[in-house]
Regions:
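Basic nucleic-acid-binding interfaces
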Residues: 1-158
Length: 158
């Protein structure tokens, strides 16, 4: 267990944070995904937050982070989402048309404290992209008639 310290404080504050683009749109591919990763990493370094594990999926972001006790989680997530939105729109101006001028991320987020199960959460985040791809493959079968094996479009056979 890694224990950090401030002047008169010993701390070990780890959090699993999940947030998504507005309308849960799948936009994090290729160059945009890399830019989001770079931006989030840079913003975390500015605040002294250590990223233990992170995964950017097409429609959401998982982060396992270590936040100093001098920063509240809600402040940090607000800072991360607010600043990253401005920087993403600066690099990818075309996204403003999909999301409006100031809203890239949806309003809410999920946060959970991490105790002794940090390794399990780290593994979960590492496997998240694989799990999403498997789920997408499963949903592809919903559009195939189970009796004939032929594609189905809006309840009708082609």
């Amino acid at each position: 267990m890694d224990i950090n310290s401030l002047a008169h404080t010993k701390w070990n504050c780890k959090y699993h944070i999940v947030f998504a683009p507005k309308y849960r749109r799948k936009v994090a591919y290729g160059k945009i995904k890399q830019d989001i990763a770079d931006i989030l990493s840079m913003l975390c370094k500015r605040k002294g937050v250590k990223i233990i594990e992170a995964e950017i999926c097409p429609d959401h972001v998982h982060m396992l982070v270590e936040i100093p006790p001098s920063i509240s989680v809600s402040y940090f997530v607000g800072y991360l989402k607010g600043k990253s939105t401005l920087m993403i729109f600066e690099r990818h101006a075309n996204l403003k048309y999909k999301y409006g001028n100031r809203h890239f991320w949806c309003r809410g987020y999920y946060v959970d404290t991490v105790g002794k199960n940090a390794k399990k959460i780290q593994e979960y985040i590492q496997n998240q992209l694989k799990n999403d791809l498997e789920y997408d493959q499963l949903t592809l079968n919903e559009y195939i008639d189970p009796f004939t094996g032929e594609p189905v479009k809006k309840g009708r056979k082609k």
